[in-house]
Amino acid sequence: MWFFARDPVRDFPFELSPEPPEGSPPGPWVLHRGRKKATGSPVSIFVYDVKPVAEEQTQVAKAAFKRLKTLRHPNILAYIDGLETDKCLHVVTEAVTPLGVYLKARAEAGGLKELELSWGLHQIVKALSFLVNDCSLIHNNVCMAAVFVDRAGEWKLGGLDYMYSAQGNGGGPPRKGIPELEQYDPPELADGSGRAVREKWSADMWRLGCLIWEVFNGPLPRAAALRNPGKIPKSLVPHYCELVGANPKVRPNPARFLQNCRAPGGFMNNRFVETNLFLEEIQIKEPAEKQKFFQELSKSLDSFPEDFCRHKVLPQLLTAFEFGSAGAVVLTPLFKVGKFLNAEEYQQKIIPVVVKMFSSTDRAMRIRLLQQMEQFIQYLDEPTVNTQIFPHVVHGFLDTNPAIREQTVKSMLLLAPKLNETNLNVELMKHFARLQAKDEQGPIRCNTTVCLGKIGSYLSASTRHRVLTSAFSRATKDPFAPSRVAGVLGFAATHNLYSMNDCAHKILPVLCGLTVDPEKSVRDQAFKAIRSFLSKLESVSEDPTQLAEVEKDVHAASSPGMGGAAASWAGWAVTGVSSLTSKLIRAHPTAALAETNVPQRPAPEGLPAPAPTPVPATPTTSGPWETQEESKDTEEDSSAADRWDDEDWGSLEQEAESVLAQRDDWSTGNQASRAGQASNPGHRSQESDWSSWEAEGSWEQDWQEPSPPAPPPEGTRLASEYNWGGPEPSDKGYPFAALSVHREAGAQSRRDSWGDDNWEGLETESRQAKAELARKKREERRREMEAKRAEKKAAKGPMKLGTRKLD
């Protein structure tokens, strides 16, 4: 009965958008936007209303419905679903836009690039080649109205209404009856000439020539306009002329047309087309080919269309990471494409992959993530950072690779604002204490101090009181000169976090001791910091009512704003991820290394002390704490220091990594120190003021004194101590040499709470080790020369009687 009947359109799983139809092509179909009811995903719906008086058009529409349903090709409009009733036909395809509408919209936004047009035409020609050569079908409707563009910018061939078989089955081509479409018919169809000698692709290739003309010049007014190429690129004109030639026999096959355009210098021979062709076949490519492709992809992404990167490159990158073996090379193009996404898309597509990557054991993957953290840190929420990312990142502090340890330290600058109380004030501080005390690489100890100065404002008040003074005081005793500079600047950058009592009793005594440091850069920074702290104390002394205002931040809760103010004093930018030591190591690696070998203790009595080694321009302070009485030399140092933020932190992973591994005395010193600990368990350095922490994570001084070697006979000197190339050095270049002797002699006689070490013992042992190594090399060289002489004598054979050979 009729009231039990159901409306098939209402039960259809897709619904039409209420918006008016968009640019429907000429023909029986009307194009609507739509969506899937279950998921809301966008689709395109072609609708044909059956009319009793248009039976011929109805048959054409049903034939097109059948063709589109059975034909599957990447360059042909993708069929999703369909509905056929007595009243209408619905064909659901992927979401597309008519080419004419797409070109008009892009022209208003600046126009399409030739790269996009070359790939779009490549796709249409490839679809024609599939139809004609593989399916023996003639499209018979190639024009602007039959081409559609998806959201990735891919061109799709549609308009299959008038398709027929090239083998003659089923009669001739169907009649169109639409003037807008018949104007693209080749001339031989109009006058009936040349039918017997034309190829099966001749008519479609003529229509392809019309499409090319319209793409570059706009709508075709009449067939005679094809004689003028207009704006068609010069590299495409010769091949275009073959398409619109009067003789149908000379029109090329679609496959040969593609081959001609892909030749060197051809219109379709470019990086964009090559990238698309590789992506189409990426599933069958070798792993080595994929690695090379992804490595080179980042350079080309800047010239590629944004929609193409978002909707075609990004899915391939995600698939390659999840199911392939691409590894770390995927990260650079992945984050580059991520810039085109909004916050919601980034959370859905990129962040799950990033979180999964942090659990990888691949070192290359981990260091790439740390280096590029600045690009995605803003999209990470605090629970994700604390539960899924930080537990994996902290493993980098214990890694044997110095580059990973350094990058892990630098990443804390970005993670600190998102860490919870436990991870920031307990877990992270333990690792920082271990690195600053035990790491054998001077730049890593220096960068740890730099990072601590930048994140100091995020720490709780109790942690700041317990950690900052201890850590920066330890840094001022480091034998690596940039670390001592970092300690001084750390005090200055966090000056608002100390009470006046701490400034007077803890900080100023440490800074005053640095005024006789062997390195001028350290002395300069120490004097600046002393003046700034003294000015605060003096202002409070003159007006005690200012004490509350000056100490307002001492017991305040952690505040990012405080960190920004502190960082500006030393020119540190949180978003810039700059390194204090990068300039010293990258620009002057030999000078930076020499600092670790400069004697930090005076020479034996009666021997001339070596002159202090000058260092490159080191960071100086700039901002409200600078005084007006600074000298011209100090101002020049300040201008050089302002460029810290322009430097890169990548110091260890490049040339300095190999040099430091060979020459840094810290490796030798630590090995000797650990050997001394193993032989004498009772020999332990005193704990620092931060003694409440576990031994592993406290700021106690863990650098042990090696047992001093037997002293040489009086008056003897090592060969390395002589100045072979010039006059004997004197103390004139260093006016504080005498003061330094007394100061350091006093430091040897007592043990303060920071566990000061005898760095002279380390250096003496290092020099002896180098002398022993040189002696062994000489002995080995002598043995090699003797062996070569023996081989030469044996090769000459026995000497003859009565003769004498001279060797």
Curated annotation (Swiss-Prot):
Transmembrane segments: none annotated. Residues 14-314 form the Protein kinase domain. Keywords: Coiled coil, Cytoplasm, Cytoskeleton, ER-Golgi transport, Golgi apparatus, Phosphoprotein, Repeat, Transport. It holds the Pfam family Pkinase. Residues 14-35, 592-807 are annotated as: Disordered. The modification Phosphoserine is found at residue 753. HEAT repeats lie at residues 350-388, 389-427, 507-545. Residues 18-28, 601-617 have a biased composition (Pro residues). Residues 792-807 are annotated as: Interaction with COPB1. The protein kinase domain is predicted to be catalytically inactive. Regulates COPI-mediated retrograde protein traffic at the interface between the Golgi apparatus and the endoplasmic reticulum. Involved in the maintenance of the Golgi apparatus morphology. This is N-terminal kinase-like protein. The lineage of its organism: Eukaryota, Metazoa, Chordata, Craniata, Vertebrata. The gene is SCYL1.
